[in-house]
C-alpha cells in the first residue's frame, strides 16, 4: 500500500511536532506533540494550524487544537504501530527528505529497539509539491500530496 507522509518539525533537523500519513484509499493517521519552544517561523506558520484539519466527511467543520489532543512520542509510536498493522507492506512517499528522517526517528524506541512494522520502502519526490487546504498542517499537506500524485497518474503524467 502506498502511503503519503508529511511532518512538521521545529526548524531544520528540529524536534517533531506532527506526523501524518494518508493511504491510497484515504485512511489517515495524524498525531501531534507540544512544541514548548518554537522557532519564530513555526510559531507563526505551524502552531496556528496544528490540529486543524478536515474531518471526514469532507465539508465538516475543522477540528481545533486542544491540549488534551497532544500525544507523547511513546503514544505516537504505539498508535503508529497499530495503524501500520493493517498493511502487508507499506511504500512511504514524501516530498521532502526530512519527512522520511522524522518518520524513521519515530520508529526507534530505544537503543537497538523499534516498533514492529510491515516491510517498509520509501521514496522522495520533488514533483508532488501541492498547496493544501491548510498549509503547514501535516495531515492536509499529506492529503494534498496524495491527490496530486493520483491525479498525475490518472492523467498519464507519471
Identify what each model region corresponds to:
Residues 98-117:
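Substrate-recognition/cap helix-loop segment adjacent to the acidic, metal-dependent catalytic center
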Amino acid at each position: 500500500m502506498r502511503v503519503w507522509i508529511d511532518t512538521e518539525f521545529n526548524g531544520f533537523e528540529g524536534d517533531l511536532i506532527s506526523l501524518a500519513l494518508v493511504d491510497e484509499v484515504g485512511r489517515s493517521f495524524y498525531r501531534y506533540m507540544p512544541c514548548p519552544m518554537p522557532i519564530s517561523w513555526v510559531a507563526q506558520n505551524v502552531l496556528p494550524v496544528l490540529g486543524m484539519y478536515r474531518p471526514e466527511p469532507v465539508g465538516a467543520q475543522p477540528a481545533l487544537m486542544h491540549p488534551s489532543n497532544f500525544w507523547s512520542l511513546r503514544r505516537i509510536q504505539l498508535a503508529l504501530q497499530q495503524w501500520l498493522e493493517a498493511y502487508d507492506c507499506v511504500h512511504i512517499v514524501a516530498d521532502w527528505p526530512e519527512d522520511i528522517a522524522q518518520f524513521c526517528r519515530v520508529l526507534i524506541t530505544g537503543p537497538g529497539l523499534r516498533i514492529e512494522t510491515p516491510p517498509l520502502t520509501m521514496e522522495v519526490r520533488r514533483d508532488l509539491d501541492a498547496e493544501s487546504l491548510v498549509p503547514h498542517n501535516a495531515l492536509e499537506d499529506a492529503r494534498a500530496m496524495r491527490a496530486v500524485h493520483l491525479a498525475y497518474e490518472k492523467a498519464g503524467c507519471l
